[in-house]
Amino acid sequence: CIFCSHGGSGDFAASRTLSVTEQIEAGKQQSAKKYTGSSYIAYFQAYTNTYASLEYLETLYMEAITHPDIRILSIATRPDCLSEKILDLLENLNRIKPVWVELGLQTIHEESARYIRRGYELPVFENAVSELRKRGIDVIVHTILCLPNETEQDILKTIEYLNHQDIQGIKLQL
């Protein structure tokens, strides 16, 4: 997509050269400067976090989900990168601790989707939501407001569409 940086939009995350546990500990130290608390969400944000081998992903996710301070595993990905095996893995992880999957939709308008090089059509998104929900996994949808050439009406149509989907959250980005 044209809106991701070379860091996969995870420019403020801990170094990917660190282990998952080391990244969690670094994140805890960073957040302790502003917030108090002892419960955290392990958020796999940068890049497409279901685009790797099943074994590799399972190792990463298990390291995060078994950390004693992690309460939720949140995974950002593309709807077209959810194979049956990945969905089964997420379902199994969801039995250990809650799993949220953040799907990058950005917009329902195909012209805008082509402009940002989203790479898949709306039915792929709808199928991903359906498959995740069948497995009891909560879905958060990432949208981008005010894409070039989109009107206020276009934005409202995207939000109205999402209001009729079986999703549990919307991430709005300007």
Regions found by a protein language model. Give the residues of each.
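Conserved SAM/AdoMet-binding glycine-rich loop
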Residues: 34-117, 127, 134
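Loop-centered beta-sheet repeat module
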Residues: 107, 118-122, 141
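Conserved residues at the C-terminal ends of beta-strands
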Residues: 7, 76, 173
